[in-house]
Design a protein with these regions (language model features):
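ATP-dependent phospho-/nucleotidyl transfer catalytic cores
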Residues: 10-34, 41-111, 116, 120-130
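Short alpha-helix boundary/capping segments
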Residues: 19-27, 138-141, 166-169
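A general structural signal marking secondary-structure boundaries and capping sites
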Residues: 36-39, 43, 153, 157
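Short glycine/proline-enriched turns and hinge-like loops at secondary-structure junctions
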Residues: 122-124, 141-144
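Activation of the activation-loop gatekeeper triad in protein kinase-fold domains
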Residues: 132-137
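Active-site activation/catalytic loop segments of kinase-like enzymes and analogous catalytic loops
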Residues: 143-173
Length: 173
């Protein structure tokens, strides 16, 4: 079987890889906020988990511990302070997951890739038009999308930047 996916072309829209102004970053938040708002009443549990355990922090933490034990690249000693920082926060690692499981946080439709280049902006006004790249949409916590957007927005380099010294966290946006 062959499957095709098609989209409507959004005239007079632009897609930015990095924000050129603080307003660009703000408009990405408007786009994803609108996405969340429009899907507030959608039964998120009906969605398929397209990337299993993507935001399951306890599962990621277990994988970290296993990798640290093996240290396959023999680099753990070089980042010991960072490792200790992560290990010291084990008690908090499952907070969101536990709250979702207990029903203390609502299960929502989440995008899970809330980067600026997943929001089309009007070419003239630069206002958010729509959210795109919906292949990662699945059930989760809206905190996932918020955290991912902050991760992207505060970064000083592209997420696939090879030179790690270019990557910092900017608090100016």
């Amino acid at each position: 079987d062959a499957y095709w996916r098609t989209y409507d072309f959004v005239e007079d829209s632009i897609c930015l890889q990095l924000p050129e102004t603080d307003e660009d970053f703000y408009q990405s938040a408007v786009g994803f906020g609108t996405f969340q708002q429009l899907l507030t009443d959608f039964p998120a549990a009906k969605l398929h988990e397209t990337i299993p355990n993507f935001h399951n922090t306890p599962d990621r933490y277990r994988a970290l511990l296993e990798t640290l034990e093996r240290d396959p690249m023999h680099r753990a000693a070089q980042v010991q302070p960072e490792i200790e920082f992560a290990l010291a926060r084990q008690a908090e690692m499952a907070t969101i997951q536990n709250a979702l499981t207990a029903g203390e946080l609502p299960l929502r439709v989440t995008h899970n890739d809330t980067k600026l280049n997943n929001v089309l902006l009007d070419a003239k006004t630069r206002k958010a038009l729509c959210v795109i790249d919906l292949d990662t949409v699945m059930p989760g916590s809206s905190l996932y999308d918020f955290g991912d957007s902050i991760r992207f927005g505060a970064a000083t380099a592209a997420e696939d930047e090879k030179d790690i010294f270019k990557m910092e966290m900017s608090l100016d946006r």
